[in-house]
């Protein structure tokens, strides 16, 4: 699974890219539901959210 760190700028680029709808808007940053996140296995070669994040704030946990 992946996690979005406090460096998130709330740009919303990641949310529509998630094929399993694991990303949602939190109060100040976007949140990844780690129980739903599949690291895009079976969908993409790399996690889609990581690929589109402009500030590289999405990390593997």
UniProtKB/Swiss-Prot annotation:
It holds the Pfam family Fer4. Coiled coil: none annotated. [4Fe-4S] cluster 2 binds at residues 18, 37, 40, 49. The keyword Cell membrane does not apply. Gene3D superfamilies: 3.30.70.20. One of its GO terms (molecular function) is metal ion binding. Its cofactor is [4Fe-4S] cluster. Keywords: 4Fe-4S, Electron transport, Iron, Iron-sulfur, Metal-binding, Repeat, Transport. SUPFAM superfamilies: 4Fe-4S ferredoxins. [4Fe-4S] cluster 1 binds at residues 8, 11, 14, 53. This is Ferredoxin-2. Residues 2-27, 28-61 form the 4Fe-4S ferredoxin-type domain.
């Amino acid at each position: 699974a992946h996690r979005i760190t406090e460096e998130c700028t709330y740009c919303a680029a990641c949310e529509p890219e998630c094929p399993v709808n694991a990303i949602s808007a939190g109060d100040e940053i976007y949140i990844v539901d780690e129980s739903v996140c599949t690291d895009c296995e079976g969908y993409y070669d790399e996690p889609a959210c990581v690929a589109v994040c402009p500030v590289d704030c999405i990390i593997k946990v």
